[in-house]
A protein has these predicted regions:
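Metallocofactor- and cofactor-centric catalytic cores in central/energy metabolism, strongly enriched
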Residues: 1-174
Length: 174
């Protein structure tokens, strides 16, 4: 079990470190050493507690209620994106439906891509879709940051994803 002051904060710290462009390879020389710090198993605990440890946005959140405006909302992202990782938070590492708490997954995966593949952090877009959650405990938690509605239907989700893919391709065609 991680403690609040150490492991659970690592995804947030990782993002801050990547923004500062610190050189981690002097201390961590292999992906095997780095992965447990910024992804599995640390990211699972961070996702479970995301609504408790949240300090600032680490990516973009798009709500089901944003339908029809996704392309305009993407204009708010200040960087030229080369790679996006997205989640709807419904199936997080065997932990179940965590809704928008799943943001740790795209953040963590993109941290690995940055650390192991040399992708510039500013060229990444962690993206979480708030399409509701079937996790009643989360919907009732006063700290939960997502929509307090059940997950949308598969058909509605597909239509949302179609609009999103068109918007992403239009905004960043490369």
């Amino acid at each position: 079990m991680c403690t609040f002051s150490t492991d659970c904060c690592l995804p947030t710290l990782r993002y801050e470190i990547s923004k500062l462009s610190l050189n981690l390879d002097k201390k961590l020389t292999t992906a095997q050493e780095l992965t447990p710090l910024i992804y599995t198993p640390t990211v699972g605990e961070a996702c479970v507690r995301w609504h408790e440890i949240f300090t600032q946005p680490e990516g973009m959140y798009l709500s089901f209620h944003d339908r029809g405006h996704l392309r305009q909302i993407l204009e708010n992202w200040p960087y030229n994106v080369e790679i996006t990782v997205l989640t709807d938070g419904s199936r997080i590492l065997g932990l179940g439906d965590l809704g928008v708490n799943g943001m740790g997954i795209p953040v963590g995966k993109l941290a690995l891509y940055t650390a192991c593949a040399g992708i510039r952090p500013e060229a990444t877009l962690p993206l979480t879709l708030d399409l509701g959650t079937n996790n009643v405990a989360l919907r009732e938690d006063p700290l939960y940051m997502g929509s307090r509605m059940p997950k949308v239907s598969a058909e509605d989700e597909r239509e949302f994803l179609d609009e999103l893919m068109a918007a992403l391709t239009d905004k960043w065609p490369g």
